[in-house]
Structure formats: C-alpha cells, structure tokens
Amino acid sequence: MTRHPTAIDDESLIAALRLASGSDPVPARVTDAARAAFGLRLPDATTARPVATPVPRGVRSAEEPRLLRFTAAELTVELEITSLDGLVDLAGQVTPCPEAGTLVEIRTLHLTESRALSPTGQFAVTGLPPGWFSVVCRRPGDSPVVTSWTRIRP
C-alpha cells in the first residue's frame, strides 16, 4: 500500500514558515562567520582543485610531511605541510614557474601571509596556526588562481 503525504494548503504552509522564521534566529556568531567567509572569496579567480598525491614508495608513515597538489587548467600548486609545536609550516612550488613579480598569498581565516616566488617557483611560510587555509597565486597580467580551502590539523 502506497502512502501519500498529507496535502498542505498554501495558507497553512506560509503560516508555518512565519512561525518557524521568528522562533529560531540565526546566532550572531554564525552570521559573523558567514560574513567573514564571504569576504574571503575571490570572484575573478580560477579555482585550483585538489589532486590525489600518492605516498612515495619506501615511506613508512603518511603522517609527516603531508603532500598536497592543486591544479587549474594552466597551473599546479604543490604543497608540503609539516607541524611542529602546534604550528604549521608550509613549503610550496608553483609550476610552470610564473614570470617575475608573481606573488602567493597563504590565507587563513585570521591572517594572510604574502611571499614572492623564487626564480624556481618556490615559497615557504612558517608558524601558521592550524585550521583552514587557501593559497592564491597572483601573476602579473593574469587572473589569480586560488586553491580550494583545506583544513590543516597538527
């Protein structure tokens, strides 16, 4: 036997929605976090998506260092993440090596660190807090490439 859901008329539905919207307001901390997250978006950027990185042969533990790779159509961002004393160190390389004047920004929810790339496309940041991060590559004359947000746990 098939059960059919009880039909609800439009007036009852609207009354229920009004009742629900007034009785459970969104907490201020949730609204503040949503505004902060919205402020971190880069609408003109190309998003580099994560790509699986195999654990190198001969490695006994996949815990340290952690390797991540992100790719967009024309760019790859490779990251090596290590943790020490509750803080995070991040070393990375952008390939193919962008032209001189290219900057990377390592963004967390609370701070942004900027670095110029070395001639071989490498960069490093030490002492980051654990948590969510994203890397933005800003190349002169091109739209930025941004990695998806990734969570680092020490």
Residues covered by each model-derived region:
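Glycine-centered loop-to-beta-strand initiation motif
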Residues: 92, 116-135
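Edge beta-strands of extracellular beta-sandwich domains
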Residues: 142-154
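Positively biased amphipathic helices and basic secretion/translocation or surface-docking motifs
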Residues: 1-61
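Beta-strand-rich domain onsets/edges
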Residues: 35-89, 95-99, 151-154
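Exposed beta-strand and adjacent loop surfaces of beta-rich binding modules
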Residues: 89, 101-103, 132
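Short amphipathic beta-strand segments in non-cytosolic proteins
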Residues: 98-114
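Glycine-centered tight beta-turn/hairpin loop motif at sheet-sheet or coil-to-beta transitions
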Residues: 72-76, 110, 141-142
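Conserved structural position at the C-terminal beta-strand
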Residues: 137-139
